[in-house]
A protein has these predicted regions:
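Tandem CBS (Cystathionine beta-synthase) repeat/Bateman regulatory domains
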Residues: 1-135
Length: 135
């Protein structure tokens, strides 16, 4: 019986993470997302005892645009998800996929042992890797 090769989150995550402050306007966050092509932004901690937040395009469409609110007058902290479920770079992507399914996640920050964001992983990243590698 052959041993299955384990693929770690670190192998599929994106390391280009865009971080913003919670006081950033939603309008500015949209501009950043458009320019970078990002679907998610990580919101910085405000102090050591704080947690990271995350802003998704879906937050903007559901909580701002669909509610006919002005993105120029809203701050990211008003609509972001916080705290967010994070994953470790050493995690097997099969468990990451299960975590995403169990908690209905589409993105998660990847956080190292020092508590720093080192990447972001998405359902899309996991699915593409699995497709490319016949998993």
């Amino acid at each position: 019986m052959s041993e299955r090769q384990v693929t770690r989150v670190s192998a599929v995550m994106k390391t280009e993470v865009i971080m913003v402050d919670g006081l950033t306007t939603v309008d500015e966050a949209l501009r950043i997302m458009k320019k970078s092509g990002a679907d998610a932004l990580i919101v910085n901690k405000r102090h050591d005892d704080d947690e990271y937040g995350m802003l998704l395009l879906s937050h903007i469409t559901k909580k701002v645009l669909a509610m006919n609110r002005a993105p120029q007058r809203m701050n990211v902290y008003e609509i972001m998800a916080k705290p967010v479920i994070s994953v470790r770079p050493e995690m097997d992507i099969r468990y990451c996929a299960r975590l995403f399914e169990n908690f209905r996640l589409s993105f998660a920050p990847v956080i190292n042992r020092d508590g720093e964001v080192i990447g972001i992983v998405s359902n899309y990243d996991i699915a593409l890797h699995s497709m490319d590698n016949g998993e």
